[in-house]
Amino acid sequence: MKQRLQDSIDLKMKYQTRSYNQLAFVNCLQGKCEEAIQNLSTAETILRENHEDEFDKRIIITYGNYAWVYYHKGQLTKAQSYLDKLERICQQFPDASRYTAMIPEVYGEKGWSLLNSGVQQYKEAMECFETALEQDPSNTDWIVGYAIVLSRLEQLSGVTESVDSSHSVKQWRRVLKLDPNDAEAMVQLALKLRVFEQYEEADTLVKQALEKSPGVPYVLRYAAKFYRCAGNIEKALKLLDKALKMSPNSAFLHHQKGACYQNKIKTLKKTRGSIDSGKIDKLINDCKDCFTKAFELKPSFIIAKLNYAHVCSINGEYREAEKIYNELLELENTCPENKQDIRFEVGLFEQNYKHSKSNAIKYLLEGFKIKYDSKSRNNCRTHLEKIAENPQQDIVAFCIRGIIHMLDGEECFEKILEIERGKIVTCSR
């Protein structure tokens, strides 16, 4: 996270104040309070120079962070001085508390902070953006944040919608209606449209985005992802190399480059006839190097580790793959989606490479039993159902179906209880 924030600052991307505030928070957590104070001082200077007319609204977060950092430094008088500044500002807003005014600017910034804090915070981030937009519906900054979090939640759910029912598509179109030159919104919308097979419009949007912002890393990386998903691997690699020159320490970019090599490996493996073993070996090494770099830069990058293990499996390095899978299975402090991803990939490894049907079922069931709606959970279910499609109708198939039906029944019962609790709360008001 710290590297990503530093990249956004070094590349002079929009909303640097936000990056400095979040960097201050990270530095304070790491005990680097002096660096945190310097980050906040820079954020304050940017606001004074660029937003003089809205300074009081926009400075609330920064002053709150000042108070928090000085409190952690043990400088209580200094912390109180910033609380006093907040109190004077909050007096301007009728519904404000003593030190906090819950105005759109505060809700919006809180939404961005939560969005950058990980998957567990996405739903609360969505609610913050919704609240901000209720009061300021034309603020493209909040709409972009709202569109991003909706896109991620839709992707996590694994539920295939239609282009007309996708809430994130509506929000990305809303951004472009207010700001037709927003290249970042163009590539994000293009990625969503490609999912719904709107290929022509998606391709046009990516080309327009690259014409408008050919040197913006954010545009380059998502355009590269678009071309990789479209099968144009060479185009994707070219864009990723360009982006890496500007952001050499981006775990995301290294991972995307590894994913491109992984696609090339799969294509070559499927090719009939003689295969250049030297070419395959080089691709595998390049692929592993990219994934290694990604999780070295971001140790919590579970997908990069899973991808690395999968490449080891393809290359016959089963012991290395198994070692990584076992390490990942022992992780406790990770989000439910990561736990599902791990168990799904381990299940496939057991089924396809170790040829252990019983172990595959064990891990796929573990993934499915984690009650968190996600694409990986759906994948676990789909593979279990395929295993259960046994023409001999053996006891294993019946057990799998029984467990799936039992879990479905539990979830239906829990939803009924939630609805009934909601009725009771409504009646008691």
Tell me what each language-model feature is.
Residues R4-M13, I46-K57, I89-I103, W142, ...:
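Flexible helix-coil transition and linker loops at the boundaries of alpha-helical arrays
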Residues S8, A43, L86, A132, ...:
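Canonical positions in the second alpha-helix
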Residues K14, K57, P137, P180, ...:
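Short coil turns that delineate tetratricopeptide repeat
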Residues Q16, L23, Y66, I103, ...:
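Structural register within alpha-helical repeat arrays
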Residues S19, A96, W142, A185, ...:
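TPR alpha-solenoid repeat register
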Residues V26, V69, S113-L115, V149, ...:
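Residue-level signature for tetratricopeptide repeat
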Residues H51-E52, G74, N116-V119, A147, ...:
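Short coil/turn linking the two alpha-helices of tandem helical-hairpin repeats
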